[in-house]
UniProtKB/Swiss-Prot annotation:
Keywords: Ribonucleoprotein, Ribosomal protein. Disulfide bonds: none annotated. This is Small ribosomal subunit protein eS24. GO terms for molecular function: structural constituent of ribosome. InterPro entries: Nucleotide-bd_a/b_plait_sf, Ribosomal_eS24, Ribosomal_eS24_CS, Ribosomal_uL23/eL15/eS24_sf. HAMAP family: Ribosomal_eS24 (MF_00545). Belongs to the eukaryotic ribosomal protein eS24 family. It comes from the Archaea.
Protein backbone atom coordinates (compact mmCIF):
# COMPACT_ATOMS: atom_id res chain seq x y z
CA UNK A 1 0.00 0.00 0.00
CA UNK A 2 1.32 3.40 -1.00
CA UNK A 3 -0.25 6.71 0.07
CA UNK A 4 0.18 9.92 -1.90
CA UNK A 5 -0.94 13.22 -0.34
CA UNK A 6 -2.78 15.22 -3.00
CA UNK A 7 -3.76 18.29 -0.99
CA UNK A 8 -3.41 19.70 2.52
CA UNK A 9 -5.60 22.64 3.54
CA UNK A 10 -5.27 24.51 6.80
CA UNK A 11 -8.59 25.52 8.32
CA UNK A 12 -7.57 28.06 10.95
CA UNK A 13 -11.15 28.95 11.89
CA UNK A 14 -11.88 25.39 13.05
CA UNK A 15 -8.32 24.60 14.10
CA UNK A 16 -7.52 21.65 11.87
CA UNK A 17 -5.72 20.46 8.75
CA UNK A 18 -7.75 18.79 6.00
CA UNK A 19 -5.80 16.11 4.15
CA UNK A 20 -6.80 14.61 0.81
CA UNK A 21 -4.92 11.52 -0.32
CA UNK A 22 -4.80 8.66 -2.81
CA UNK A 23 -4.02 5.07 -1.88
CA UNK A 24 -2.45 2.68 -4.37
CA UNK A 25 -3.09 -0.94 -3.47
CA UNK A 26 -2.53 -3.16 -6.53
CA UNK A 27 -3.65 -6.75 -6.03
CA UNK A 28 -5.02 -5.99 -2.55
CA UNK A 29 -8.45 -5.08 -1.18
CA UNK A 30 -9.18 -1.57 0.06
CA UNK A 31 -6.97 -0.98 3.12
CA UNK A 32 -8.60 -0.64 6.53
CA UNK A 33 -9.05 2.74 8.18
CA UNK A 34 -6.68 1.65 10.94
CA UNK A 35 -3.89 0.86 8.45
CA UNK A 36 -4.40 4.10 6.51
CA UNK A 37 -4.53 6.20 9.69
CA UNK A 38 -1.33 4.57 10.96
CA UNK A 39 0.50 5.30 7.74
CA UNK A 40 -0.77 8.92 7.51
CA UNK A 41 0.19 9.61 11.13
CA UNK A 42 3.69 8.27 10.47
CA UNK A 43 4.11 10.13 7.16
CA UNK A 44 2.99 13.54 8.43
CA UNK A 45 4.08 13.20 12.08
CA UNK A 46 0.53 13.66 13.43
CA UNK A 47 -1.08 12.74 16.74
CA UNK A 48 -3.29 9.64 16.25
CA UNK A 49 -5.65 10.81 19.04
CA UNK A 50 -6.61 13.91 17.05
CA UNK A 51 -6.60 12.45 13.53
CA UNK A 52 -9.85 11.25 11.96
CA UNK A 53 -10.35 9.41 8.67
CA UNK A 54 -13.53 10.89 7.21
CA UNK A 55 -13.80 8.55 4.23
CA UNK A 56 -11.99 6.15 1.93
CA UNK A 57 -13.64 5.63 -1.46
CA UNK A 58 -12.74 2.80 -3.79
CA UNK A 59 -13.72 2.50 -7.41
CA UNK A 60 -14.84 -0.76 -8.99
CA UNK A 61 -12.08 -2.54 -10.87
CA UNK A 62 -9.44 -0.06 -9.78
CA UNK A 63 -6.41 -0.43 -7.56
CA UNK A 64 -6.70 3.18 -6.39
CA UNK A 65 -8.79 4.67 -3.59
CA UNK A 66 -9.25 8.28 -2.53
CA UNK A 67 -9.60 9.48 1.02
CA UNK A 68 -10.07 12.46 3.27
CA UNK A 69 -8.69 12.89 6.79
CA UNK A 70 -8.80 15.67 9.36
CA UNK A 71 -6.12 16.50 11.90
CA UNK A 72 -7.21 18.69 14.82
CA UNK A 73 -4.77 20.78 16.84
CA UNK A 74 -6.91 20.36 19.98
CA UNK A 75 -8.69 17.17 21.11
CA UNK A 76 -11.51 19.06 22.87
CA UNK A 77 -12.36 20.90 19.66
CA UNK A 78 -12.37 17.62 17.72
CA UNK A 79 -14.76 16.05 20.25
CA UNK A 80 -17.04 19.09 19.94
CA UNK A 81 -17.08 19.26 16.12
CA UNK A 82 -16.90 15.67 14.87
CA UNK A 83 -20.07 13.54 14.85
CA UNK A 84 -20.12 10.78 17.45
CA UNK A 85 -20.37 7.97 14.88
CA UNK A 86 -17.11 9.10 13.23
CA UNK A 87 -15.29 9.14 16.56
CA UNK A 88 -16.62 5.65 17.37
CA UNK A 89 -15.70 4.34 13.92
CA UNK A 90 -12.14 5.64 14.27
CA UNK A 91 -11.80 4.17 17.77
CA UNK A 92 -11.32 7.52 19.49
CA UNK A 93 -14.30 7.05 21.83
CA UNK A 94 -16.15 3.94 22.94
CA UNK A 95 -19.76 3.22 22.03
CA UNK A 96 -22.08 3.92 24.96
CA UNK A 97 -23.72 0.93 26.63
CA UNK A 98 -27.28 0.26 25.46
CA UNK A 99 -27.01 1.98 22.08
Amino acid sequence: MEIKITEVKENKLIGRKEIYFEIYHPGEPTPSRKDVKGKLVAMLDLNPETTVIQYIRSYFGSYKSKGYAKYYYDKDRMLYIEPEYILIRDGIIEKKEGE
